[in-house]
Amino acid sequence: MKTFIKYILAAPLMLCFSSCLDEHPKDQLDQEAIYNNADNIYKNAVASLYNYIGSNQESEGLQGTCRGIYDYNTLTTDEAMNPIRGGDWYDGGLWENMYQHKWNANDINLYNVWKYLFKVIVISNQSLSIIDSHKSLLSAEQTRDFTAEVRAVRALFYYYAMDMFGRVPIVTSYDVKLEQVTQSERSEVFKFIVDELQDVAPQLADEHSNKEGDYYGRVTRPVANFLLAKLALNAEIYTDDNWTNGKRQDGKNIYFNVNGEKKNAWETCIWYCEQLRQEGYELESDYASNFAVHNENSKENIFTIPLDKNLYLNEYHYLFRSRHYKHGGAYGGSSENGTCATVSTVKAFGYGTDHVDNRFKINFYADTVLVDGKKIYLDNGKPLVYMPLELKLNLSDSPYKQTAGARVGKYEVDRTAYSDGRQVDNDIVLFRYGDALLMEAEAKVRNGEDGSIELNAIRDRVGMPHVEANLDNILKERLLELVWEGWRRQDLIRFGKYTKAYDQRTPLEKESTGFTTVFPIPQRCLDLNKKLKQNPSY
């Protein structure tokens, strides 16, 4: 059905740079046998890295699983929450603390995210070492291209590490010793990522990574261009090494060297978004088609996690985690009755008014639930009716504790899914052109230009009236267009709203300094490496 490179897994990594990679697991094939020609070197030193983009393990994968990057970028924001439902979803206060920004350095899930990200970074360094030591078996072009792709993957994971933890170590050698690992400032990590991507982009294939074939699921030049646009858009944040003093550089005064020209952050973002347009990306006429069971031919999706329940173990948990038990049962499986959109989110979509956004029914399950045109009934004999406006962080005393909250939609239901709907055929969308248009609109407005063409192209696609291209409308449109796609935390930080009060969340003491915009360095890592210093106010 789907064509994707299969490979031999690379070895797992050291924790927080505390020990070396285990190069000799019992089931590992002879090193020379698996690196004895160019095809095997690519499969086992380059393609193997893509095993780590998705996952079926908690806190691993860029999206799809729970208690990881996606949850910290979504369930810490005004977009969504996992409310306590009587005896369900307390989990030691995990979800409530996440929503209230009450995490700390001993949070095991943050530690697991750090461990996951640096696992892939270290394995990438190992891959670069393997390519270099076997270059006698490769042509100069193969050596260049393999190296470029691995560096791009490594830059991708450094991007997520920097975005979450700010000051992280830059390690580019596989055989580095613990005492050599030092912490870099966030601005240094930012510059490293930008330099790496700009350096390798010309060597990356220009293919559309979301389409089936030899480049399916890989980091190609358009993926790098999207990431460079995202880095430029957030340059004010990422170049700020003292994020608790309330000051940051204006993007107009942050400069990049782009194709030999000096451009400010906003001009840089616009330039990379324009490259995506030139590379053939465009909006799909049908918004929902980007999230269909078979979405590999989308003209809009740029970078996806390939899912195929018959080939891969990668999972997509968010429909399963959100739907009521009976709702999942109607599809022949189960569900966990958890994640919901906040009241402010559904109100942003116009729920409860005569002007509901046309994307609402695609993105959410709300009101009376129908499956195959039939109502679903609860154990008490009443039909299942989700109540979007009855949501509270703690529903233990609510008559709506089982049904409060609009539930996760967006992705078409795969009626042949495995594992209670977690193993599906819908590829998980990480980057898409609709986001790039909104980035371009925002960059233009911040640069004193008119972003209305890009902003209203998004609204035209879903049959919504035009709005003025100002920052407030752009932030709202990003919620309407990108809900459930994992961008809300970054957006709120960039717009200065992440530490503000919102739905049933009161800011923490001293949170006005912005200290929660960066997560704490895990205590286990600080204990292992005394050269690492904690982020401010943790």
What feature does the model see in each segment?
Residues 19-22, 117-120, 192-194, 215, ...:
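Long, intrinsically disordered, low-complexity segments
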Residues 34, 38-47, 51-61, 85-165, ...:
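Conserved, well-structured interaction surfaces
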Residues 19-74, 249-250, 525-538:
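Membrane-proximal, proline-rich intrinsically disordered regions
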Residues 90-102, 351-431:
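Flexible, polar/acidic helix-loop-strand segments at domain edges
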Residues 32, 60-82, 174, 204-223, ...:
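Short, surface-exposed recognition loops and adjoining beta-strand edges that mediate ligand/DNA contacts
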Residues 55, 286, 290-294, 298-392, ...:
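Glycine-rich, aromatic-lined ligand/substrate-binding cores of catalytic
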